[in-house]
């Protein structure tokens, strides 16, 4: 996005580099793979100013970024760690009646990323098992890292009880929160 800074340091020695890759809006999820060339070009232009051993580790998310990570990993000899989040094969096995299946090109791209990765991060044991059973990932290279929340940063300013009172929820009510799209595999 044009309003983002070029680089953001999120921790000591950990930077997020924003790359320009295609239009800033108006693309559907299905159209994103068409921007892989633009993403690759943008990264390669950035990377040519760096030595090949600049990175100790690459970590990509979602299959499209994984494709770029695979190429950079092969080019530089840097290990690639990848997090899928969702996969075409799992989604296609659990489609709701009205849902359109994920394209075969995505499944193929995911298979390539799995094979090219030094390690794969899954959020759950079920996700790890699907990487092994559906994508032939080596079980020794799949690591479960459950997502979490920093409760010091993200907590009600005046406590849970006050939040429940504001929302008119009984203090002893059991609460469940779901954040995400409602899909059968989730």
Predicted stretch roles:
Residues 123, 145, 178-180:
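Short hydrophobic "strand-cap" motifs at the C-terminus of beta-strands
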Residues 170-186:
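Conserved donor-binding/catalytic core segment of Leloir-type glycosyltransferases
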Residues 88, 101-120:
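Membrane-proximal helix-turn-helix segments that form the acceptor-binding/catalytic region
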């Amino acid at each position: 996005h044009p309003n983002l800074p070029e680089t953001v340091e999120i921790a000591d020695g950990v930077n997020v580099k924003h790359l320009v890759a295609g239009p800033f809006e108006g693309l559907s999820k299905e159209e994103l793979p068409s921007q892989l060339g633009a993403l690759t070009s943008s990264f390669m232009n950035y990377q040519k100013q760096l030595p090949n051993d600049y990175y100790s580790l690459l970590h990509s998310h979602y299959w499209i970024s994984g494709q770029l990570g695979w190429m950079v990993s092969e080019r530089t000899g840097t290990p690639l760690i990848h997090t899928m989040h969702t996969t075409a094969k799992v989604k296609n096995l659990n489609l709701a009646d009205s849902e359109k299946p994920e394209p075969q090109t995505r499944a193929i791209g995911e298979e390539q990323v799995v094979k090219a990765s030094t390690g794969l991060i899954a959020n759950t044991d079920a996700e790890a098992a699907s990487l092994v059973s559906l994508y032939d990932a080596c079980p020794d290279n799949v690591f479960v890292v459950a997502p979490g929340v920093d409760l010091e940063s993200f907590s009600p300013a005046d406590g849970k009880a006050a939040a429940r009172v504001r929302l008119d929820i009984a203090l002893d009510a059991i609460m469940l929160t779901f954040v995400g799209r409602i899909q059968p595999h989730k």
